[in-house]
Amino acid sequence: MIEVGDLKKGMFIIYDGEIYRVLEASKHFMGRGSGLIRTKLKNVKTGFVREVNFPSGEKVQEAELSFRKAQYLYRDGDHYYFMTLDDYEQYALSEEEIGDAKYYLVENMEVDLVFHEGTPIGIELPTTVELTVVETEPSFKGDTVSGGGKPAVLETGLKITVPYFIEVGDKIKVDTRTGEYVGRA
């Protein structure tokens, strides 16, 4: 059992007999009374997102999960295919199970497949990934004076803000937790 005040984005819990991934968790305190933990939970099987408010101090069950190293192979329709590196078994995950991780997946990339009772329910990405810029505005001399950045589209369709010196074709590092530019690859 885990206290709801310790819930963090990305954790898996069992609530109402179903497995949920925590999308958001924030603490709210009201005057004298005890606090409230507001969460946004995504049902792993159905993809349904619900908001649940827990009184602080309440406990929930953390889902028992196992992780296996896998390689992302390809996408076919709305399914993503992975091969485990230990026994070379292939698994397909739906777009709902993958979620926003689809914007960081590049063929042959290594990820951790998340299993619950022998069934894959999601993936864990590395902290940073290298992606290629496919579309951005050209930079001009003196652009760096104003600071900030310019919009760019990456090979996976992810749209982020990059510094002015980044050009089309550049490989950059992106933080998978925040979706922000980290540096050149």
UniProtKB/Swiss-Prot annotation:
Q: What is this protein called?
A: Elongation factor P
Q: What does this protein do?
A: Involved in peptide bond synthesis. Stimulates efficient translation and peptide-bond synthesis on native or reconstituted 70S ribosomes in vitro. Probably functions indirectly by altering the affinity of the ribosome for aminoacyl-tRNA, thus increasing their reactivity as acceptors for peptidyl transferase.
Q: Annotated pathway, please?
A: Protein biosynthesis; polypeptide chain elongation
| Gene Ontology BP annotations | peptide biosynthetic process
List localization entries: Cytoplasm
- GO cellular component terms, semicolon-separated: cytoplasm
Q: In the record, what terms sit under GO molecular function? A: translation elongation factor activity
Gene3D superfamilies in UniProt: 2.30.30.30, Nucleic acid-binding proteins (2.40.50.140)
Lineage, opening ranks? Bacteria, Thermotogati, Thermotogota, Thermotogae, Thermotogales
InterPro entries recorded? Elong-fact-P_C, NA-bd_OB-fold, Rib_uL2_dom2, Transl_elong_fac_P/YeiP, Transl_elong_KOW-like, Transl_elong_P/YeiP_cen, Transl_elong_P/YeiP_CS, Transl_elongation_fac_P
Please, which domain of life does this record's source organism belong to? Bacteria
UniProt lists the family membership as follows: Belongs to the elongation factor P family.
Which residue ranges traverse the bilayer? none
Q: Look up and give the organism this protein is from.
A: Thermotoga maritima (strain ATCC 43589 / DSM 3109 / JCM 10099 / NBRC 100826 / MSB8)
CDD domains in the record: S1_EF-P_repeat_1, S1_EF-P_repeat_2
Q: What disulfide bonds does the UniProt entry report for this chain?
A: none
The main location is cytoplasm
Q: Keyword set for this entry?
A: Cytoplasm, Elongation factor, Protein biosynthesis
Q: Which Pfam families does this UniProt record tie to the protein?
A: EFP (PF01132), EFP_N (PF08207), Elong-fact-P_C (PF09285)
Note the NCBIfam families from the entry.
efp, PRK00529.1
